[in-house]
Amino acid sequence: MDQKIPYDDYQLPVVFLPSYENPPAWIPPQERIHHPDYNNELAQFLPRTIVLKKPPGAQLGFNIRGGKASQLGIFISKVVPDSDAHRAGLQEGDQVLSVNEVDFQDIEHSRAVEILKTAREILMKVRYFPYNYQRQKERTVH
């Protein structure tokens, strides 16, 4: 004989969902072109080339984080204001795709640092990819 459990005795699971971000307010189509919530300009996310020349003993003007262990790539984590890197257009959140024809998408952090420190002329292919950069920062915060 099956016994039925009263509805009030069920233990319901507790689920925590991420906070919901409300969509932007409706804006007439003719006004959307200049509104940041409706900006669909993707050029900033396209790969670009950065060329830097580093005199002996000089600093690069930027820091990197990540590498093979993070499985997200190498990212620019800081750019020194008014440095050559800053003037060349490097920015925090840029993913380094390659340096001097060396693929940086699956490279150990220490190897990436070695390549950047020893090169006198640096030809970098980067792309602005803030989403993976943010994921990487979240993974490394303790």
From Swiss-Prot:
GO terms for biological process: neurotransmitter secretion; pore complex assembly; regulation of synaptic assembly at neuromuscular junction; synaptic vesicle transport. GO terms for cellular component: basolateral plasma membrane; cell-cell junction; cytosol; presynapse. One of its GO terms (molecular function) is protein-macromolecule adaptor activity. SMART domains: PDZ. The keyword Cytoplasm applies. Residues 49-131 form the PDZ domain. It comes from the Eukaryota. Keywords: Cytoplasm. Its main location: cytoplasm. It is found in: Cytoplasm. PANTHER family: PROTEIN LIN-7 HOMOLOG. This is PDZ domain-containing protein 11. The lineage of its organism: Eukaryota, Metazoa, Chordata, Craniata, Vertebrata.
